[in-house]
Amino acid sequence: MLESMPGMGSGYMHGMIPYYRTKLPVFYAIETRDWKSAAALEPVAGSPPEVSTLVYWARAVAHGHLRQSEQARADLARYDELLVEIRKGKRAYIAEGTFTKIEHAEMLGWVAFAEGKQDEAFTNMRTVADLQDKVGQAEVDIPAREMLADMLLESGHAQQALSEYEIALKLSPNRLNGLYNAGRAAEAAGERSKAQFYYATLMKSTNNGQNSTRPELTHARRFVSVTQSAAN
């Protein structure tokens, strides 16, 4: 796609090419929750260190979900090495920025989660979620509070997860993963009316999932249909 845009071939926009070649695959893998693909991401050739950090952030998140602690810790170590490189360059301020601190704290949370240190993981992620709620997100950031909810749900704390998803959705409304997993958490917590609400909202926001084969939408559609049939 980028090769078809000749205006990006020189000047400032040329320098943005590694950024977009990195960012698009990273967020596609994370948003589709394709953890194996996210864990296999590699920096784009020629990327500056401040761009490559995004790859290792995504890998740490993925390895956290996959419970691959050694790999998650290696991702964190490489991220830290890149921060050292950034501090030596002309854009050293990036290493001390709030969004970098949020990314780094999220990685610490996922490393702890992968290592089975649930309480530490929850504490780290709750702290960073509170910070992010105050300062706001970058344009396509994954809400840290949604990550906290993911951890709680994957650890069997459905009711707590539901509460965190609900807070996340107030700040980042209509996110597919937020709505779907709020529905999952509600189901697991035995709150079928809330599950129905979140799944129905998901169906509405995706045009009933007509143009998608994602299993999340299939599950939500089936749940809504069964619940509506039972009510009639």
Residue ranges and their predicted role:
Residues M1-S4, R73-V84, L176, E187-N211:
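TPR/TPR-like (Sel1-like) alpha-helical repeat modules
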Residues L2-G15, L41-E50, D80-E96, A129-Q137, ...:
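Solenoid-like repeat scaffolds
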